[in-house]
Amino acid sequence: MFVDQVKIYVKGGDGGNGMVAFRREKYVPKGGPAGGDGGKGGDVVFVVDEGLRTLMDFRYQRHFKAPRGENGMSKNQHGKNAEDLLVKVPPGTVVIDADTNEVLADLTEQGQRFVVAKGGRGGRGNTRFATAANPAPEIAENGEPGEERNVILELKLLADVGLVGFPSVGKSTLLSVVSAARPKIAEYHFTTLVPNLGVVETEDGRSFVMADLPGLIEGAHEGVGLGHQFLRHIERTRVIVHVIDMAAVEGRDPYDDYVVINEELKQYNLRLTERPQIVAANKMDMPNAEENLRRFKEKVGEAVPVFPISAATRQGVRELLFAIADLLETTPEFPLHELEEPAVQRVVYKYEKEELPFTITRGSDGAFILSGEKIEKLFKMTDFSREESVRRFARQLRAMGVDDALRERGAKDGDTVRLLDYEFEFVDDWDER
C-alpha cells in the first residue's frame, strides 16, 4: 500500500457562545447587560517535523478537529480562546484542496507551519448589543463555526540520492549494506512497494539520505506497474544512482535496461534527465558479469560514470559512496517546475466570481430551500431560544434580500421555508418591531 498520498478531513474549532447576563449587585441600580463574549476556536495547523518520513500515521487517523472556544460568562468575563491543534507532517508534504485541486502549501523546512483550517470567532455577549434605544438587550451570538475542508496530503520524498532500476536488480540489498535501513528483500519482483529511506555515512564523515525506490518497468510513465507512485518520489532527488543487474540474471541485456529506464524518466518529466546519474553495475560476483560490463562500457562511453559493485559481498561499495558524496557537494537542488527569471517578481491576479449570499431552490414537497455559506453561518450563530435574537435574524434576512427573493419565486403567506435542518413559515406582512 502506498501511504504517500492520503485524504483527510480537518475542521477548525467553533467559537464559544456569547452570554446573556445582567448585573444584579445590591448597590448597582440599573446595572445593565454583563454578558461576556465567547472565546475563539482553535486552528488546525500543519507543522513540519523532520523526524517523520512517511504519511503512515494518517492511515489510522483521518479526522482532525480543533477544540472550540470557551463560552462567555457573566460579569463581562470573556471565554478563553481554544488551543490550536498541531498536526505533524514530514518534510516534503504538499497540501492540496480535495474539492478544487488547488495546491494550498508545500511544506519543506523544519518547523514550517500552515494553518489549514481557521477556528471560528467567539460569539458576542449581550453587552455588545446595548444601544440607547435598547440598553438591556437579551441578544447574544452563538460562536462562529470553524472552517472545515477535505485535503489531500502528498509526500514527495526529500532524499538526496534515489536508487532506480528494474525490479530485483539489488537496490534494496545495496541500501541495507550502506545504511541502517532494513528494507524487505526477496527473490521476486516488486518486493519494495513503498520507498525505504536510509542515512548513509562515508568513512570521511559525510552523510546523505538514500532512497530505495520501487522498481520501474517499461511503460511506467503511463502508470504501468508501480508507475506514477514510483516516479512521484524521484522528483526531488538530487542524484540518481542507476542500479543495473550486470549478470543479466533475468535474461535482459544490461544496456537495454539502462536505455529503457532513462526513457521512462524522460517521458515522465524532462527535468529528471538533468540530474547527474551514476551507474552501479551490480552482481559483479556472478558469472558473465565481467563480459557484460565490458560491452556495456563500450556502448555508454565515458559520459556516465560506471562503478562495478557487488551489494551482496560489498565489493566496490566504498568507492561508489565516495563518488556519490563528491557529486552531491557540487549538485544544487533542482526546481520541480520550469525555471523563471529570478529577478522578475510576478503577481498573479485571479478573477474570483463573487459568491451569492444565498440561493433558493424548491424541494420535492414544495418547500423553499435556502442555502449558501453566508446565510448558513448567520443561522448557526443565532440563538433561537431568545425572541430578540429571532427578530434580529429576521431583520438580517430582510436586509440580505431574502424576503424579496422568496416573493419573486412565488412564496405566499404560510409557505414552508427550509434552512439546513430547520423549517420556518413565510410571513408576508411580518412586523419587525
Swiss-Prot record:
GO terms for biological process: ribosome biogenesis. Coiled coil: none annotated. Residues 350-428 form the OCT domain. Residues 1-158 form the Obg domain. Residues 159-329 form the OBG-type G domain. GTP binds at residues 165-172, 190-194, 212-215, 282-285, 310-312. Mg(2+) binds at S172, T192. GO terms for cellular component: cytoplasm. Pfam families: DUF1967, GTP1_OBG, MMR_HSR1. GO terms for molecular function: GTP binding; GTPase activity; magnesium ion binding. It is found in: Cytoplasm. Its EC number is 3.6.5.-. Keywords: Cytoplasm, GTP-binding, Hydrolase, Magnesium, Metal-binding, Nucleotide-binding. Its cofactor is Mg(2+). Its main location: cytoplasm. An essential GTPase which binds GTP, GDP and possibly (p)ppGpp with moderate affinity, with high nucleotide exchange rates and a fairly low GTP hydrolysis rate. Plays a role in control of the cell cycle, stress response, ribosome biogenesis and in those bacteria that undergo differentiation, in morphogenesis control. Belongs to the TRAFAC class OBG-HflX-like GTPase superfamily. OBG GTPase family. Monomer. HAMAP family: GTPase_Obg. This is GTPase Obg.
